[in-house]
Amino acid sequence: MIEFQQVHKTYRVAGREIPALNPTSLTIEDGQVFGLIGHSGAGKSTMLRLINRLEEPSGGTIIVDGEDVTAFNASQLRGFRQQVGMIFQHFNLLASKTVADNVALPLALAGELSRSEIDKRVTELLARVGLSDHAKKYPAQLSGGQKQRVGIARALSTNPKILLCDEATSALDPQTTASVLQLLAEINRELKLTIVLITHEMDVIRRVCDRVAVMDAGQIVEQGSVAEVFLHPQHPTTKRFVQEDEQVDEGEQRDDFAHVPGRIVRLTFQGDATYAPLLGTVARETGVDYSILAGRIDRIKDVPYGQLTLALIGGDMEAAFARFKAADVHMEVLR
């Protein structure tokens, strides 16, 4: 478990103190994939790097597995960092070393394994990330996605309990991003690693995370399960991220719907309810006609969800609303 207890970070620049992270408390459970999302300058990178003390906190306490990381001396910190892997946006591979040597580097520096043991471990790691045939290649011979897979293998080399991902997919194309996220999900599931990732893309959060914290101006403005935050955003920053992900402009949508008669509602379905024939049933039972104005079906991690924007006309409107709520469908009345 990772706990932030009123942790804050301030930089001193040209004689002025610039807050990067306001006093923040947060708990990340073992085995979770936890996402920190925010625009540039929100404080997410600072928060991530505080976990392994690449950034030193200005105050507060960071507890990992019951131990106060902020109180570690240099020797304790070195040992702790071997339990925390990290992957980066720009891969940070050594150009003069082969793929195998890049992955072996942390093990060689630790000095705890023989050469044959290191070679065996590297072979296992390259197989896990799908690069067994690339061991003798150099970084310049790899695609961006392959470079990131090398970075992931290197981060796993010391059998960490925690994996920190610093914008790990932001330099990749959508297809490669999807494959890297799938790999991270497999690693989380099979190795029971706690993964903390930062991103500015809601799609990344939706694909792989269990819980998410939304950051803005150095503070967490909203947090919860990905389904709660993604489907029912409360803070304006969260709503902007969701709109960007859905590629929806609410102002334009309101204008488009201005001429549509009746009540306009947005329904959100999760799990099995996503595929249930609810609209037809409600229409028959209440006499309410409907027009579908917008809709989508997608997934949050492995759970399907659907959203429909409807115009409802005639019949027993209150009975229709009650029927939607009884079916455990979230309903938002837009007009």
From Swiss-Prot:
Transmembrane annotation, as ranges: none
Specify the superkingdom: Bacteria
Q: Which GO terms describe its cellular component?
A: plasma membrane
Name where it mostly resides: membrane
Q: Which UniProt keywords apply?
A: Amino-acid transport, ATP-binding, Cell inner membrane, Cell membrane, Membrane, Nucleotide-binding, Translocase, Transport
Annotated GO MF terms: ABC-type D-methionine transporter activity; ATP binding; ATP hydrolysis activity
Q: Which InterPro entries match?
A: AAA+_ATPase, ABC_transporter-like_ATP-bd, ABC_transporter-like_CS, ACT-like_dom_sf, MetN_ABC, MetN_ABC_transporter-like, NIL_domain, P-loop_NTPase
* Top class in the EC scheme: translocase
Give the reactions, separated by semicolons, that this protein catalyses.
L-methionine(out) + ATP + H2O = L-methionine(in) + ADP + phosphate + H(+); D-methionine(out) + ATP + H2O = D-methionine(in) + ADP + phosphate + H(+)
Mode of membrane association:
Peripheral membrane protein
Cell compartment(s), UniProt: Cell inner membrane
For the ligand (ATP), the binding residues are 38-45
Keyword field contains Cytoplasm? no
Subunit (UniProt)? The complex is composed of two ATP-binding proteins (MetN), two transmembrane proteins (MetI) and a solute-binding protein (MetQ).
| Protein known as | Methionine import ATP-binding protein MetN 1
Protein species of origin: Pseudomonas putida (strain ATCC 47054 / DSM 6125 / CFBP 8728 / NCIMB 11950 / KT2440)
